[in-house]
A protein has these predicted regions:
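Bacterial Sec-dependent N-terminal signal peptides
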Residues: 1-22
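A domain-start/cap signature at the N-terminus of enzymes
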Residues: 18-54, 90, 124, 130, ...
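Gly/Ser-rich "nucleophile elbow"/oxyanion-hole loop immediately N-terminal to the catalytic nucleophile
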Residues: 45-50, 104-151
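Active-site machinery of serine-nucleophile hydrolases
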Residues: 61-125
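Alpha-helical scaffolding within the catalytic cores
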Residues: 73-83, 176-184, 206, 210
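Short, proline-enriched alpha-helix->beta-strand connector loops that line the catalytic pocket
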Residues: 88-90, 187-192
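Primarily recognizes the serine-hydrolase "nucleophile elbow" in alpha/beta-hydrolase
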Residues: 133-188
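C-terminal catalytic histidine-bearing segment of alpha/beta-hydrolase fold enzymes
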Residues: 175, 191-259
Length: 259
């Protein structure tokens, strides 16, 4: 009985240590002078691994701003969950796009029929890429396990980032996002998991269906999960899936596709 109590105390202590951690407030300054607010969650203090995954979370339109808080509205608590922190330790970045800007495009797309990439990356998007590059120099970052995800506007930016720099990422999770399908043809070595609600009136569900089809035809490892009756907030049922973190952390980039 005494041994059981000691075990329980040790386990509880581990959970409390993880739960006590918070997202740190950070600012990244890009080479062009762009300042990007972001929040950083470090691996749980109890984690024993020598190298950890790097996760980038790109928020949607409604979380833009300068408060360095709103970007945690969706997804932040999932990573702070003490069970997840203990089981899935990682460096997690939540950058915040300024209120007057957009991640991947200069403005909200007038049509989802032709989402061509901007020739020049928007300044916040470019700053995110530079921030990723900076973290990849850290010795305790596992370069074979770099994951990116995003919802709505952030889902579009997830597609955009991976289509431009597929060599960096092991996995991508675009949620209710959109992309010009032809831009996915050259992607190799990245696993995708796409989520969308079939009743979405903000970003049409066909955007994810077409992206899934394009990735499948390109031979990319991809899974598509569609939620019947769900409107734009498909991130809610996505984050509630028991296998959300498990699937993500199983993905590892082969050396063949790393540069």
């Amino acid at each position: 009985m005494k041994r059981i109590l000691i075990t329980v105390v040790l386990l509880l202590g581990g959970y409390l240590a993880a739960f006590g951690q918070e997202f740190e407030r950070m600012v990244f300054t890009a080479e062009d002078g762009t300042e990007l607010n972001y929040r950083l969650l470090r691996p749980a203090e109890t984690a024993k691994a020598k190298k950890f995954p790097l996760i980038i979370f790109l928020h949607g339109l409604g979380e833009r701003g300068t408060d360095n808080d709103r970007q945690l509205t969706w997804g932040g608590n999932m990573f702070l969950n003490p069970v997840n922190m203990e089981k899935y330790p990682a460096y997690v970045l939540f950058p915040q796009c300024p209120e007057t800007a957009f991640w991947a495009y200069k403005d909200i797309p007038a049509s989802y029929d032709a989402l061509d990439a901007e020739e020049q990356m928007p300044a916040p998007f470019k700053a995110v890429k530079e921030m990723i590059d900076t973290y990849l120099t850290y010795p305790d970052i596992d370069r074979s396990r770099v994951y990116i995800m995003g919802l709505s506007m952030g889902g579009m930016a997830t597609y955009d980032m991976v289509s431009r720099f597929p060599e960096i990422f092991a996995a991508a999770i675009p949620i209710c996002g959109a992309v010009e399908p032809s831009r996915l043809a050259g992607i190799e070595g990245v696993s995708f998991r796409i989520f969308h609600g079939d009743a979405d009136t903000d970003v049409p569900v066909r955007c994810s269906r077409e992206a899934y089809k394009a990735l499948k035809e390109a031979g990319v490892k991809v899974e598509y999960i569609e939620f019947p009756g769900c409107t734009h907030g498909s991130w809610n049922p996505a984050f509630c899936r028991d296998d959300f973190m498990e699937w993500l952390f199983k993905q590892k980039k082969s050396r063949k596709y790393q540069k």
